[in-house]
């Protein structure tokens, strides 16, 4: 069940961050419903400090608090800008409720990419991945290079500091080149 999996994830984050934050030479102990750790030397430590924990999801209650407590980055993948904005606001409120500066968190999203030189190119790429152009325009990064740049600027205005782009047709290298040459230099 989802609730139980979320409980397990919460404990996993408590354990891993507890291990990472235990000073060298000290031991870490944890006793929870799903995990018990006794006298762990809490080694090795991660190279990055703080470790880049990414918490993602669209759950309106528990996810924002989990992100506020543990994440370096919050990600809501494959949603529209409005849903992204609403969820980020919940995360900011959760940060404030536990005394964390909401600006200490990075906010990101993930989108499916479908960029083409013209409408026919876009439609061909959407069909190749079994998706509808209109759905991709709503929830993805879809359109001409100019439209993609505008869409990324809208995401940025909504608070996205980082975007993860997903190419579903891994054989279409021209698609990757198009994004790299005509979109990315301008955002």
Name these PLM-found stretches.
Residues 1-187:
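Active-site-adjacent structural elements that line small-molecule/cofactor binding pockets in enzymes
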């Amino acid at each position: 069940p989802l609730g139980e999996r979320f409980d397990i994830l919460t404990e996993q984050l408590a354990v891993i961050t507890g291990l990472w934050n235990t000073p060298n030479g000290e031991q870490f102990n944890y006793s929870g419903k799903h995990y018990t750790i006794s006298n762990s030397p809490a080694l090795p430590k991660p190279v990055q400090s703080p470790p880049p924990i990414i918490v993602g999801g669209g759950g309106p209650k528990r996810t924002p608090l989990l992100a506020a407590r543990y994440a370096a980055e919050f990600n809501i993948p494959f949603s529209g800008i409005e849903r992204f904005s609403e969820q980020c606001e919940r995360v900011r409120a959760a940060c404030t409720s536990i005394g964390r500066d909401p600006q200490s968190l990075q906010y990101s999203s993930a989108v499916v990419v479908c960029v083409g030189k013209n409408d026919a190119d876009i439609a061909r790429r959407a069909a190749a991945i079994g998706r509808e152009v209109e759905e991709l325009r709503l929830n993805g990064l879809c359109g001409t290079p100019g439209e993609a740049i505008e869409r990324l600027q809208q995401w940025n205005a909504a608070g996205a500091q980082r975007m993860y782009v997903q190419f579903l047709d891994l054989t279409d290298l021209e698609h990757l080149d198009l994004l790299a040459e005509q979109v990315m230099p301008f955002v």
